[in-house]
Amino acid sequence: MKEMVSSSTFRAPGGLGFLGPSKIGLIPLRNRSGVRSRVKYIAPKCAVSSARPASQPRFIQHKKEAFWFYRFLSIVYDHVINPGHWTEDMRDDALEPAELYHHGLKVVDVGGGTGFTTLGIVKHVDNENVTLLDQSPHQLEKARQKVALNGVNIIEGDAEDLPYPTDTFDRYVSAGSIEYWPDPQRGIREAYRVLKLGGVACLIGPVHPTFWLSRFFADMWMLFPKEEEYIEWFQKAGFQDVKIKRIGPKWYRGVRRHGLIMGCSVTGVKRSSGDSPLQLGPKAEDVEKPVNPFTFIFRFVMGTICASYYVLVPIYMWMKDQIVPKDQPI
């Protein structure tokens, strides 16, 4: 399933989503084999219902509280989350727009966690030219245990405040991280800042579901942006040639209905050197403020319940895929 949206023809709508066909934001559809045959164009459709504003953090969008969530998630991430939401085929497909065509490219993988996405990057780029950054020491410890990542620079850091000078990297990659950011616009602005002139940012993340129950759990749990939100954030940060590529397991025929932790790959090009033209105020989140233990326990339990729903959804979709004819939606 490969579908692309280009900002050259895309204009973010002012309403709640795409309500019908339009000449704006046309997507070329290809067949399942990925071979371009008779091309058909549609307008991208997102949930008509209003999503919870990105400025209102979900249960797992608080860095200090998420620290403990990551600690336990790191134990099962590669074995439980990835098989249903982030397979090797999906990873390689999603990284294709990043144009990792030369082994000498300097690449940063922001929010790289256990290093699953980094494993896809080092297929094309020399390990010593790759940096893996994440805020969770427990996730990074799992990455350090992967022999294939020997030589990769693995460091702890904040996606919204990258510890690098302006114009440092040729490629910026971030997969499965934006949904945890308290301020996604700030993180994408940082992506622009640390890239060199002509650099490409490739951000892989979830999509907002349309089914009411999935939408409820998504908005409670973490950030599931709409496609037009991704494009707006990239363009505001200064990126040009912004494109969206829809991704998902072949058996998961409900990416837009139920959402997916890895549902699209968004790319943009930095056409001017220097800092982003977007100026933002100070961070809204105070990570030094002590966490109320009762609030933390409530949020942690509720966040875990929401996460469990999205662990079960891929299993449900796989079972339906085995039953429902391939030419019918599920």
Curated annotation (Swiss-Prot):
Residue ranges, annotated region (SAM motif III): 193-206
A biological process from GO: methylation
Alphabetically ordered keywords of this record: Chloroplast, Membrane, Methyltransferase, Plastid, Plastid inner membrane, S-adenosyl-L-methionine, Transferase, Transit peptide, Transmembrane, Transmembrane helix
Stretches assigned to the Chloroplast intermembrane side: 46-295
Broadest EC class assigned to this enzyme: transferase
Region (SAM motif I): 107-116
Primary localisation category: plastid
Reaction equations catalysed: 2-methyl-6-phytyl-1,4-benzene-1,4-diol + S-adenosyl-L-methionine = 2,3-dimethyl-6-phytylbenzene-1,4-diol + S-adenosyl-L-homocysteine + H(+); 2-methyl-6-(all-trans-nonaprenyl)benzene-1,4-diol + S-adenosyl-L-methionine = plastoquinol-9 + S-adenosyl-L-homocysteine + H(+); 6-geranylgeranyl-2-methylbenzene-1,4-diol + S-adenosyl-L-methionine = 6-geranylgeranyl-2,3-dimethylbenzene-1,4-diol + S-adenosyl-L-homocysteine + H(+)
Molecular function via GO: 2-methyl-6-geranylgeranyl-1,4-benzoquinol methyltransferase activity; 2-methyl-6-phytyl-1,4-benzoquinone methyltransferase activity; 2-methyl-6-solanyl-1,4-benzoquinone methyltransferase activity
PANTHER family referenced in this protein's UniProt entry, alphabetically: 2-METHYL-6-PHYTYL-1,4-HYDROQUINONE METHYLTRANSFERASE 1, CHLOROPLASTIC, 2-METHYL-6-PHYTYL-1,4-HYDROQUINONE METHYLTRANSFERASE, CHLOROPLASTIC
Annotated family: Belongs to the class I-like SAM-binding methyltransferase superfamily. MPBQ/MBSQ MT family.
Protein's recorded name: 2-methyl-6-phytyl-1,4-hydroquinone methyltransferase 1, chloroplastic
Organism, as annotated: Oryza sativa subsp. japonica (Rice)
